[in-house]
Amino acid sequence: MDFRVMGLESPLFHTLQHMMDMSEDGAGDNKTHNAPTWSYVRDAKAMAATPADVKEYPNSYVFEIDMPGLKSGDIKVQVEDDNLLLICGERKRDEEKEGAKYLRMERRVGKLMRKFVLPENANTDAISAVCQDGVLSVTVQKLPPPEPKKPRTIQVKVA
């Protein structure tokens, strides 16, 4: 992906483009560098550019994530490692119609992603997701609080 096409020619994007190019071509014969991989940079960029709100209610947690231009079938909601909520999707560029060319392209295309570590009381078996007007709402129900243990009485015997 060339950031210059999108009108992004800042030094930050130039460096990012250079890092991605290095990762794709293996940076020549020097395999000892510690540059991040292209997929890591892409995921980090997607996470930084995907705004989200997290709310806590008495019985649930609600994650609201902007997913503009995506249909519900284009969005993936997963739980990994029992407590990591992963939300991702990808907005593809609209196909150009014959005779039309972009003069300016400002709407975001590419990967949208967020990861959240769920609290211990999150019920990962009770998760629902609804996408409406470009906003995804993921509701994670809370587990009921553990019942307090009742004291156990031990009978003392006389020896």
Curated annotation (Swiss-Prot):
Keywords: Cytoplasm, Stress response. Residues 43-157 form the sHSP domain. Signal peptide: none annotated. The keyword Ubl conjugation does not apply. The keyword Cytoplasm applies. Its main location: cytoplasm. This is 17.9 kDa class II heat shock protein. The lineage of its organism: Eukaryota, Viridiplantae, Streptophyta, Embryophyta, Tracheophyta.
